[in-house]
């Protein structure tokens, strides 16, 4: 191995820098991947601000990436040179949550891009069992969206979304847009999407939402027939959870996917029994990576509308600023790392 690479490093408190550093060494059972593309998501922006939890600083962020295997452990030599993406969740396999099939809740959790260095670098080290082979020739920028699409599919599965059900998606950022497409892929109808940003509302409508409005312009749905069967809350805004209960029909379901660090919820618990709705939380990809890869590879999910900013590491500062402030139509920032 040997050699050096450049990487984006976060220090918290809105502090970041580009570093020149040795390429990662692979522990036993781990592979090293040459990263081609890595995307910043909302949790990375909280990490940049210094408001995430359970991480270390300094840290190389990045858990949404795709690349090519550079080195692999014994028994996986044939994987070298093949395109892959990978799961960020490394469970201990021995604690209660891991034994119950919930590695995202592992009591000894390792998270690539949070507790160990991630994919915003020329190379990243990943357990070989966390890697997923991609079809040869697959667009690796699109493949960098495997993890967020897996989260969207996990939400759709956990809420038991059924064909012909009526859906609202509150928050049309990256995850919200992928939930919207995933819901439609199941045969559901997305009757409504919301977002603060006009460009994101436009993308939502172009992706199949019957209507997309500013949250302040949400219609007042009073009749059972007007309300939706399922609401996906993908913004993390506490007020949006309250709005979700206004939109869902009695007996419907609300899925909480969005997450804002430190947000205080304004939900009166009495609303839940009075709404006769089920409230479900979703965290992480939930084992949906292979399904996500297949949907991206066959074009059933289109990432092109949300990959708005493909930049190099040299442009990290203005790109992060656009992502945080949602300016210039930015939905997702993706770093092109092929030359790092």
Curated annotation (Swiss-Prot):
Report the EC code(s) recorded for this entry.
1.1.1.329
Identify the InterPro entries for this entry.
ADH-like_C (IPR013149), ADH-like_N (IPR013154), D-isomer_DH_CS1 (IPR029752), GroES-like_sf (IPR011032), NAD(P)-bd_dom_sf (IPR036291), Zn_alcohol_dh (IPR050129)
The Gene Ontology terms for molecular function here are: metal ion binding; oxidoreductase activity
Which reactions does this protein catalyse? 2-deoxy-scyllo-inosamine + NADP(+) = 3-amino-2,3-dideoxy-scyllo-inosose + NADPH + H(+); 2-deoxy-scyllo-inosamine + NAD(+) = 3-amino-2,3-dideoxy-scyllo-inosose + NADH + H(+)
Needed co-factor(s)? Zn(2+)
Q: Which residues bind Zn(2+) 1?
A: 41, 63, 147
- The entry marks the following residues as binding Zn(2+) 2, namely 92, 95, 98, 106
What keywords are assigned to this protein? Answer: Metal-binding, NAD, NADP, Oxidoreductase, Zinc
Catalytic class of the enzyme: oxidoreductase
Q: Which note does the record give on the cofactor?
A: Binds 2 Zn(2+) ions per subunit.
Q: In which pathway does it act?
A: Metabolic intermediate biosynthesis; 2-deoxystreptamine biosynthesis; 2-deoxystreptamine from D-glucose 6-phosphate: step 3/4; Antibiotic biosynthesis; gentamicin biosynthesis
**Protein role:** Catalyzes the oxidation of 2-deoxy-scyllo-inosamine (DOIA) with NAD(+) or NADP(+), forming 3-amino-2,3-dideoxy-scyllo-inosose (amino-DOI).
Q: Give the family per the record.
A: Belongs to the zinc-containing alcohol dehydrogenase family. DOIA dehydrogenase subfamily.
What is this protein's name? 2-deoxy-scyllo-inosamine dehydrogenase
Species the sequence originates in: Micromonospora echinospora
Identify the coding gene. Answer: gacH
């Amino acid at each position: 191995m040997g050699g050096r690479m450049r990487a984006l490093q976060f220090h918290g408190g809105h502090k970041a820098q580009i570093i020149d550093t040795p390429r990662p060494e692979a522990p036993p059972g781990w592979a090293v991947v040459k990263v081609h593309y890595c995307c910043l998501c909302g949790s990375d922006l909280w990490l940049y601000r210094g408001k995430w939890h359970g991480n270390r600083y300094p840290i190389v962020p990045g858990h949404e990436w795709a690349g090519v295997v550079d080195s692999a452990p014994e028994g996986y030599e044939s994987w070298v040179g093949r395109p892959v993406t990978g799961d960020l969740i490394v469970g201990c396999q021995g604690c209660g949550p891991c034994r119950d099939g919930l590695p995202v809740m592992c009591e000894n959790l390792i998270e690539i891009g949070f507790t160990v260095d991630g994919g915003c670098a020329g190379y990243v080290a990943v357990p070989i069992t966390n890697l997923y082979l991609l079809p040869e020739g697959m667009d690796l920028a699109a493949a960098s969206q495997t993890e967020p699409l897996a989260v969207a599919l996990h939400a759709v599965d956990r809420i038991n979304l059924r064909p012909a059900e009526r859906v609202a998606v509150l928050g049309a950022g990256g995850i919200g847009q992928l939930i919207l497409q995933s819901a439609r892929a199941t045969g559901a109808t997305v009757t409504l999407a919301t977002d603060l940003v006009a460009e994101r509302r436009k993308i939502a409508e172009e992706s199949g939402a019957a209507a997309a409005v500013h949250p302040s312009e949400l219609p007042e749905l009073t009749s059972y027939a007007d309300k939706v069967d399922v609401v996906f809350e993908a913004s993390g805004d506490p007020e949006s959870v309250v709005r979700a209960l206004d939109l869902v029909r009695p007996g419907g379901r609300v899925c909480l996917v969005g997450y804002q660090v430190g947000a205080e919820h304004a939900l009166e618990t009495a609303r839940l029994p009075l709404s006769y709705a089920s409230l479900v939380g979703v965290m992480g990809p939930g084992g949906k990576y292979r399904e996500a890869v297949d949907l991206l590879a066959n074009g059933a999910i289109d990432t092109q509308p949300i990959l708005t900013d493909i930049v190099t590491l040299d442009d990290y500062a203005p790109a992060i600023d656009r992502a945080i402030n949602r300016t210039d139509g930015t939905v997702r920032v993706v770093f092109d790392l092929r030359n790092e």
